[in-house]
Amino acid sequence: MGGPLSDVVVDDGRIAVVGGAGPGGEGAIEFDGGGELLLPGLVDAHAHLDKTLWGLPWRSHTGGPDLAGLIANERAARRHLPPVTERAGALLDACITHGVTTVRSHVDVDPDAGLGGVEGVLAAAEARRDQVTVEVVAFPQSGMLVEPGTAELMNAAVAAGCAAVGGLDPAGFDRDPVRHLDVVFGIAERHGCKVDIHLHDRGELGAWQIEAIIARTRALGLAGRVTVSHAFAVATVPDERFARIAAGLAEQRISLATVAPGRTEPLPLRRLRDAGVNVCLGQDGIRDLWSPYGNGDLMERAALLAWRSGFRGDDDIELALDTATFGGARALGIDGYGLDPGSPADLVLLPAATVAGR
């Protein structure tokens, strides 16, 4: 990716002309891009804005080694943190600085937090609505069926403004995948919202749940409105099973979200692309009670994804970038995303001649 120097004319917040445009009309404001690489605004398709400690004094990691331990540690500590609006806003500012113009954030909903996290993130987003678009997912971080009252709160969160309903390891954590998916897809059907389910379960258990999600998506006519986040099982299933799962994902336009995880096999981006499966990228939790890592720079995360995938060629590096741009836009259903006339003029300039050179 990278081409000849071109002029771009923006009118009323949208790209009007690309290439050979020359100077704008009377009153136009000219900005010299200095030959840098122009991209559409970056899309962070998997974040946890409510969890961040961004802007606070350094806190050493105290979470346990497994999912349950991490959840318990966070629930005990978060009540002593500054308001969500303050922390989420500080992290959004960092993301904006790095060229992120759209964020999908999962936000914890449970009997302790209630809808406070959702309200806090929505408020932080509203204060920055001219700079970034934030889509909130109601997320049952502490489990849904194992935490009585959470399902009702999830429904209320979507009614209060969440664009999507989430889920968490229907089998591995909630221990009842059928009921878990009944609740999640029931909320989606009731409110007409999107679905984005965290799925860490590996092996046959994870593969079976992905196929169950595909079946629910098909049955409810939700093609193009469902995402499976992490989907670790996809990276390790046998070839025949992979082909069947990938075909179902592609048919229903179900996206997979990755965060370039460090302790598990990365999603096979090339194989998924060749099968027609969309993959998007996020930064997950940034400097929070789960992990000390992250800084809001999605391009850095895309480079990490390329490195974890063993990519070296320009085409492969561009594939990693696609997860942070067009892949995210496809997952979130952003209309007109890109650099074509008529596209929203949410643009980023990078000091490079090509993506690989970045």
What are these regions, as identified by a protein language model?
Residues M1-E26, V355:
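N-terminal metal-binding scaffold of metallo-dependent hydrolase/deaminase domains
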Residues T52-V84, A164, Q209-T227, I245-A250, ...:
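Active-site gating loops and adjacent loop-to-helix segments of metal-dependent hydrolytic enzymes
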Residues G41-T52, V107, K194-G203:
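Histidine-centered catalytic micro-motifs
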